A protein has these predicted regions:
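Conserved helicase RecA-like core
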Residues: 1-250
Length: 250
């Protein structure tokens, strides 16, 4: 919208003194990088300050900063809290074979007392594929990820909030707009890239006085990544048991 107004001559940017790019990683994930670059180029030559905020620092962010920012200062803020996970959240962690994960998820979704559930995938492709697989198995499921248009994402979020679907498959960045207190289960279909993302994921359940369950499925090729998270957060589960869709423990 900003670009359209500027190109029509209805918006003058020559007096802009401060430009703030918030949720920069989300902009990249949702495909807004070309639009952001166009706005930055429109300000090129103007004396202004640029501030860029990002929960994570993906690869394309750094070249963007180098191109459009002069001698940028990188400030990293960390939480001083030591209790990273809610005591009201029961954590269940186990290793699962990649080819068996969909069946394991389907089994877990039939748990007694399960309500609204968010399933986290690390990639847009995995999120889309899992949502399709669960829908074919008869579950009422929505999806939010960067390959979907804004209207499709908003439609899925609305359906989840209003109870039209009780399962939402999401990537980490696309899930930031979700604000639902009564999520009973969070399922980590894929292990996240870092400990804080894990904390943010499971923090979606066990909120506002409710109890919750956080299930983490560690793929055999994800064990090293999980052990980093386990050590950083002192979870005490460096080598989770191996479970299958037919396991009685599940």
């Amino acid at each position: 919208r900003l670009i359209d107004l500027h190109e029509r001559g209805n918006l003058q940017l020559d007096r802009v003194a401060i430009l703030v790019l918030d949720e920069a990683d989300e902009m990249l994930d949702l495909g807004f990088l070309p639009s952001v670059e166009a706005i930055l180029k429109a300000l090129d030559g103007n004396a202004h300050q640029t501030m860029l905020f990002s929960a994570t620092m993906p690869g394309p962010i750094l070249p963007l900063a180098r191109r459009f920012m002069e001698k940028p200062i990188h400030i990293r803020a960390e939480s001083g809290e030591q209790d990273f996970t809610h005591s009201s959240t029961r954590k269940v962690t186990f290793q699962a074979h990649r080819m068996d994960k969909v069946a394991v998820v389907a089994h877990a979704l039939q748990s007694s007392g399960r309500g609204r559930t968010i399933i986290f995938a690390r990639t847009k492709r995995a999120a889309a594929q899992l949502a399709d697989d669960l829908a074919r198995r008869g579950f009422h499921v929505g999806a939010v990820h960067g390959d979907l248009g804004q209207k499709s994402r908003e439609k899925s979020l609305h359906a989840f909030r209003t109870g039209q679907v009780d399962i939402l498959v999401a990537t980490d960045i696309a899930a930031r707009g979700i604000d639902v207190d009564d999520v009973t289960h969070v399922i980590n279909y894929q292990v996240p890239d870092d400990p804080m993302t894990f904390v943010h994921r499971i923090g979606r359940t066990g909120r506002a006085g409710h109890t919750g369950t956080a299930i983490t499925m560690v793929g055999y090729d994800e064990l090293g990544k999980w052990q980093v998270i386990n050590d950083e957060l002192d979870l005490g589960e460096p080598n989770p048991p191996q479970w299958f869709s037919t396991s009685p423990e599940l």
